[in-house]
């Protein structure tokens, strides 16, 4: 019967898992190593058949010169279009032919180029990534085609006010600073970019000492290092001057932009803590209580569940190396903007004025820890998170260490942070209506 089948299957399953785990027993926990040319390598073993690896470069939109706005993202697109030994078609097919995936994204402070593949194809993925990161040629004919693709991307983005407003809000609070720039750039400037402009940008930033190579997968660390030394022996160490200019003093602003949309879109927020600030974890927890992804967030309960005024309301936190952004967003009927703004301000005031009880705080911590745990069930996100953390902090924190930091937060710290971040005179507002 079914029980016998289950029992007969069990020993084989156990032995497979045991063999895998035995192969990795000496490797549990992450490993790191620095090559002679300055490239930092980090590896986290996993029991999955799928592995991830890639390069995270410490260069993003904020590192562009005035006349190269959009260049970091432009380079991220063009890096797949040709190297000294491969045409675009060969790059495209190299991982696709074995069912793998090549991907990349650009942020304000980093660019990440990575691949997902069955573990047995690690060598193929690493060799291809090393080729495109260090030996791209940016063919002019490919630039002309890709410029059109990026302009289409910009136009589709501009048709989505609920996304566009986030960029416009950063432009408002970092006025005149590269951090306020749109990652995609602007079409007029993009059309002026040439092959040598892309090469100039990569020659400033795409060097081993300014990036990390990350691997998440069932691989031996020695094997990774051996291959790295073989593939990257010819890549020289170059000192990169990437000292960033911090944004000037913050002045809260209020701005209304007239848009031809059915819905009004509203952002309320301010500058937040930078990535190295000890209070960042407390603000992270406050943000989750206020407008995190849970349906029981205070803003969702007040604006949507009780009153049906909005479809979407949320609050967000972004930390950069020398500053940050805290913001709340909602979309509503233009007639309801004032009511919704009043309700958001009321929730912010509650967090400033009322100390949380120990029961409320324990429940909030439990929810956040649970959400982080569920999110960590995705190895692609884990690999990218590890890359970003190692790039900026030169260390990798386990989930348990993050949970510990959350557990240490007291009601007093939350009250102090709420009064620093949510003070009414400190908030900026941007409205599309």
Please name every model-derived segment.
Residues 252-254:
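Flexible, small-/acidic-enriched active-site or ligand-binding loops
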Residues 18, 34, 90-246, 256-257, ...:
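Charge-rich, well-structured scaffold segments of protease-associated domains
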Residues 24-27, 240, 248-250, 296:
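Short solvent-exposed loop/turn micro-motifs enriched in small/polar/acidic residues
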Residues 19-50:
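N- or domain-start disorder-to-order transition segments that initiate the globular core
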Residues 38, 45-95, 169, 206, ...:
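Active/ligand-binding-proximal structured segments within catalytic/core domains
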